[in-house]
Amino acid sequence: MKNKIKYILAGCCLMTTFSCSDFLERYPLDKAVNDTYWKTEAQLRAALYPCYEGLQYDLIINLGEACAETVVWGDPTSGLSKVSGGTSSAQDNFPFYNYWRDIYGHIFDCNNFLDNYNAADVPQETKDVYAAEVKVIRALQYFWLTSVWGDVPLIDKVISSEEAYGPRNPKEEVVDWMIEDLKWAAEKLSPEIQTGQDVGRIDRWGALALMARIALQNQRYELAEKVSKYILDNSPYDLYDYEKVYHLEGNSENDPDNKESIIYSLYVKDIR
């Protein structure tokens, strides 16, 4: 009888050990995990949103028109005011530190998507459309980087923190890489302006327009002219009524006939 009790107790201990092990070895429940996440198109679409967040980054404004001599800043001691006035120094140009860090954060989101999207049980053609959108967004991030810093580290996959401090790649190499990515994306994306729930998503012309802009800024004039003319002759885009550009009625969500915005961040009134 005593032996039976010992066996029962030993069995209970083993069961407890296994059940505790199974209970403790769980994937995080408060965030997506690559090993279990990439299954459906709905998950692909959800993973696309962090990538599009990169279009809302203020670099396109603050290091563009906001730093031009036509803009007067209210606070002359602010970092961007000093950049605009030509008085910024290595000690106080914190906006540039933030931009470098944040842009590579957006690039990480894009790389994470591109490293994992093929695992989804979705038709390849559909997956490629999502990947093409992400490649355009990633190219835009590198366009900003090379426009400000020239040579930059070219990171096209998720890397470890130890690998994050590698050497810079020559600007020309990064430009060549961006153009090749955009060529691939243009082949996969729809030639139609996106509408309904897809309004604001990047289409073929967005990829080509960014390619033309990159080519122009990097003295690839023949390519810039060729791509720009192709867009002018074949795309559904056109100039918008100038008066409406600065009113809410000109927002692409409010006026589907606004065919001027090619790549843009859509803000919905009362939401974002």
Identify the role of each PLM range.
Residues 216-220, 225-272:
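Polar, glycine-rich mid-to-C-terminal structural blocks
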Residues 135, 208-215, 227:
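TPR/Sel1-like alpha-solenoid repeat signature
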Residues 29-33, 87-91, 156-163:
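Short linear capping/connector segments at secondary-structure termini
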Residues 41-57, 78-149, 165, 169-173, ...:
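Conserved, well-structured interaction surfaces
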Residues 1-29:
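Bacterial Sec-dependent N-terminal signal peptides
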Residues 27, 146-157, 221-228:
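Short, well-structured active-site flanking segments
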Residues 20-63:
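Membrane-proximal, proline-rich intrinsically disordered regions
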